[in-house]
Each structure stands twice: as structure tokens, then as C-alpha cells.
């Protein structure tokens, strides 16, 4: 390296060595005219190819920001969301990349929480009294508190995120939610909910208060007019970093619609599950109605049979009563004469009592 530098300095005119060059060489270098200025290329001619640069002479735009968006996101994915939120101060391009990653991070942590809650609920018993004494009761309490915190954050930030006026600013909140969810998944006997969620409640409350007091008044002024991304996208695309900015703006424009589609899909799944439960209940009710109708038909058949039996018994009683009357009348007609005149009233009385007893028995059967 030293020899090469000495040769380069000797070619340029002696460098710092006093005995490295002759006076004639120095004079010749002083008599050389300055190089002519570069002339612009003619319309029909081709520009000469640029000379290759040494590795230590790379252009200044060969930085992290000049990389493709996918590469930047892949690099930033190894960092925490708190660090990503702080990198928004670097430049506009980095700000757009970090905004997109923060918005996606909030949606991802919501999906991760839904997955954890679904797994815990699948292992819990259905009865509320049994859930309280279950080993996963604290897990369910912590996840329910996280769900409440996520809904508050959603109501505070996502209105303006969907309008593309800002991003989900507090990246530290996302990191803390991930920490709580991983703690719940990896611990069999977690601490109480207020102990685990103390840090999350503090930083999320501070973030929401600051957002409502300091940032929302500024964003409300932009709500009636066009948003920032719409004004940025009004400029024509040019190759280079500005084209990547336009691509990022398109992605950020599409995020609200994707989020709405995701919410609609979740609502459709919930409604489908409710419809399935209702159909199952309707089928059970139909089965019960059919069983009751069958029982009613059996009761009607039995009632008809009993009515027929009662009719037959009534007919038999009427016939027996008629025969008894005939026998009594014939007996009364045959008992004539003086000797039998005293006994005839007694026989008539007995016959009348027998007829009355038959009539009473008939009435009782008719009542039954």
C-alpha cells in the first residue's frame, strides 16, 4: 500500500518527497494546460459509459433507506416495536415503513390474542361455577383484561389510522401486550391479573391520554379535508426513492380496506356460528313437537277405544233393563187371585227397587 501511494504521488508531481522528481518534470507539469470542461452529449450520440468506481468510492445513496421495502421490513422485524416507533424520526421513507409495520403489528397482536383466548376457552368447562376453580381461571382473567385494553386502544387510535391520518404510535404498548400473552402461554400458574397487567395499563393509559390531549386536536383539523397521503400521491411518480414512497402510500391506502375486510370476515364467522346454534335448537324443537304430536295421536286413539267400550256397555245395560221389565211384568200378571193379592204389592215394590238400582248403576257408568 505504501509503495502504491508513493508511485501515485510521484506520477502527480513528486508528492511530499523532495528528491522524488526532477525539475524538468515539475516544469512540464506546470506548463500543461488545464483539462477542457466536459461537453454535453449531442442529441444523436450515445453517452460514454461511466468508469467503474472503487469499493471505497460507492455512491452516497447506497444506504439502508435505499434498499427495497421488503428488505427494510425484514431488517426491522428483528427489532422491538418501541425501537421501530423511534426510527420514524430518520426520514420520510423510514417513517412510512415504520408506520406500516406499527399498524400491522397492532393487527397481528390482536389476532395472536384471539388465538390464545380461543385455545384457553376450549379447555375451560362450560359452567361458570366450575370455571372459577379451574387451573386456567387466571389465564382467562388476564386474557379478558387484555381484550378490554385492546378494545380501548382500537377505539382511540384506529379511527384516525383508518382515515390514514396517523399510525398506531405507541410501539411499546405492542411489545408489552406480546410480553403478557407469551407469559400467559408459557406459565401454568400465572400471577393475578392486576399484577401481570400493571405495566400494560400504565403505559397504555399514558399513551391514550397523550394522544387525546396533544395529537387528536391536530388530526381533527385534517379530517374534513384530504388526508396527507392523498396530497403526497398527487405528485407524478419518478424513478428512485419517490417511486418507493408512492408504493408505500398505496400500501398504506389499502390497509384500512384490508382491516375492514378482516372485521367483516370475523363478523360473518360469528354470525355463521350463531346461525348454526339456532338451527340446532330449531331441529331439537321440531323433534320435541313431533314426539308430542305422536303422543296426542295415541291419546286420541285410546279415547276413541274407551268411548266405543262405554257405548257397548250402555247398550248391554239397556237390553238387560228391558228384559228385566218384561220378566217383572209377566210375573205381576201371573200372580192373580185372592190368596196372592196380599203378596203382589211386595213383589212390585221389590221389582221397583231392582229397577232403581239398575238405573243408578247406569248413571254412574255414564258419568265415568
Curated annotation (Swiss-Prot):
Domain F-box: 61-109
One term under GO cellular component: kinetochore
GO molecular function: identical protein binding
Subcellular location: Chromosome, Centromere, Kinetochore
GO biological process: protein polyubiquitination
PROSITE patterns from the UniProt entry: FBOX
Residues annotated with Phosphoserine modification: 235, 242, 344
Residue spans of biased composition, Gly residues class: 12-21
Highest taxon of source: Eukaryota
Keywords: Centromere, Chromosome, Kinetochore, Phosphoprotein, Ubl conjugation pathway
Biased composition (Pro residues): 32-52
InterPro entries linked: F-box-like_dom_sf (IPR036047), F-box_dom (IPR001810), FBXO28 (IPR039719)
Modified residues (Phosphothreonine): 270
Pfam families: F-box
Residue numbers spanned by region Disordered: 1-57, 328-368
Record's keyword annotation contains Ribonucleoprotein: no
Major location (coarse): nucleus
Biased composition (Basic and acidic residues): 1-11
Its biological purpose: Probably recognizes and binds to some phosphorylated proteins and promotes their ubiquitination and degradation.
Complex and partners: Part of a SCF (SKP1-cullin-F-box) protein ligase complex.
Protein name: F-box only protein 28
Organism: Bos taurus (Bovine)
Amino acid at each position: 500500500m505504501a509503495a502504491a501511494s508513493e508511485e501515485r504521488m510521484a506520477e502527480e508531481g513528486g508528492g511530499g518527497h523532495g528528491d522524488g522528481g526532477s525539475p524538468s518534470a515539475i516544469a512540464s507539469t506546470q506548463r500543461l494546460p488545464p483539462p477542457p470542461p466536459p461537453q454535453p452529449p449531442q442529441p444523436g450520440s450515445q453517452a460514454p459509459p461511466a468508469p467503474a468506481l472503487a469499493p471505497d468510492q460507492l455512491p452516497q445513496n447506497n444506504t439502508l433507506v435505499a434498499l427495497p421495502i421488503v428488505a427494510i421490513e425484514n431488517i426491522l422485524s428483528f427489532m422491538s416495536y418501541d425501537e421501530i416507533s423511534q426510527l420514524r424520526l430518520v426520514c420520510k421513507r423510514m417513517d412510512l415503513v415504520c408506520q406500516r409495520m406499527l399498524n400491522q403489528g397492532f393487527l397481528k397482536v390482536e389476532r395472536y390474542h384471539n388465538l390464545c383466548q380461543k385455545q384457553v376457552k376450549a379447555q375451560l368447562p362450560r359452567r361458570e361455577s366450575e370455571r372459577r376453580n379451574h387451573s386456567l381461571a387466571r389465564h382467562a382473567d388476564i386474557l379478558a383484561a387484555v381484550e378490554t385494553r385492546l378494545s380501548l386502544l382500537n377505539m382511540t387510535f384506529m379511527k384516525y389510522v383508518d382515515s390514514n391520518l396517523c399510525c398506531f404510535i405507541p410501539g411499546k404498548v405492542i411489545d408489552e401486550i406480546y410480553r403478557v400473552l407469551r407469559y400467559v402461554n408459557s406459565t401454568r400458574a400465572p400471577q393475578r391479573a392486576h399484577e401481570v397487567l400493571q405495566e400494560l395499563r400504565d403505559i397504555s393509559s399514558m399513551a391514550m391520554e397523550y394522544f387525546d390531549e396533544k395529537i387528536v386536536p391536530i388530526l381533527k383539523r385534517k379530517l374534513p379535508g384530504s388526508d396527507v397521503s392523498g396530497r403526497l400521491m398527487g405528485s407524478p411518480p419518478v424513478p428512485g426513492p419517490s417511486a418507493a414512497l408512492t408504493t408505500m402510500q398505496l400500501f398504506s391506502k389499502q390497509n384500512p380496506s384490508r382491516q375492514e375486510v378482516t372485521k367483516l370476515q370475523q363478523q360473518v364467522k360469528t354470525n355463521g356460528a350463531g346461525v348454526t346454534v339456532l338451527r340446532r335448537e330449531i331441529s331439537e324443537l321440531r323433534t320435541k313437537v313431533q314426539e308430542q304430536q305422536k303422543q296426542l295421536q295415541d291419546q286420541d286413539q285410546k279415547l276413541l277405544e274407551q268411548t266405543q267400550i262405554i257405548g257397548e256397555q250402555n247398550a248391554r245395560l239397556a237390553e238387560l233393563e228391558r228384559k228385566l221389565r218384561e220378566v217383572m211384568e209377566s210375573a205381576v200378571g201371573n200372580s192373580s187371585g185372592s190368596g196372592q193379592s196380599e203378596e203382589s204389592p211386595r213383589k212390585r215394590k221389590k221389582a221397583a227397587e231392582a229397577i232403581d238400582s239398575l238405573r243408578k248403576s247406569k248413571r254412574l257408568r255414564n258419568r265415568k
